[in-house]
Swiss-Prot record:
Highest taxon, organism lineage: Bacteria
HAMAP family reported in the protein's UniProt record: UPF0122
Cited NCBIfam families: PRK00118.2-3
Family, per entry: Belongs to the UPF0122 family.
Organism: Ureaplasma urealyticum serovar 10 (strain ATCC 33699 / Western)
SUPFAM superfamilies given in the database record: Sigma3 and sigma4 domains of RNA polymerase sigma factors
Protein name: UPF0122 protein UUR10_0158
Transmembrane segments: none
Length: 99
């Protein structure tokens, strides 16, 4: 079982990198992380083994972490958002976010 922070981190990475995953990987990720289905429930629904679901989702998580390690899109967005909080001018913050 993932802790809550890691779960949200993986969901954030998925939002960024889902276009790099296969249709099946996206489907399993959505069922588990967004629909909150267990591996057993997904396996029954998709008529595959529980271990196939587990293997696929472990691979997806590894890929998402690998993509972030290489591209750092999440990390850069987080740093950028942290800097926005230091700016007192809300008009300027809005303009910067629109870029």
């Amino acid at each position: 079982m993932l802790n809550k922070n890691k779960r949200w981190y993986l969901i954030a990475l998925y939002d960024i990198y889902q276009g790099l995953l296969t249709t099946k990987q996206c489907e399993y990720f959505n069922l588990h992380y967004f629909k909150d289905l267990s591996f057993s429930e997904i396996a029954e629904l998709k008529e595959v083994s529980k271990s196939a679901i587990s293997d696929c989702l472990n691979k997806v998580c590894d890929q998402l972490l690998k993509y972030e390690q290489a591209l750092l899109i999440y990390e850069k967005n987080k740093k950028r958002n942290d800097l926005y909080t230091l700016i007192n001018d809300s008009e300027l913050v809005k303009k910067l976010k629109d870029i």
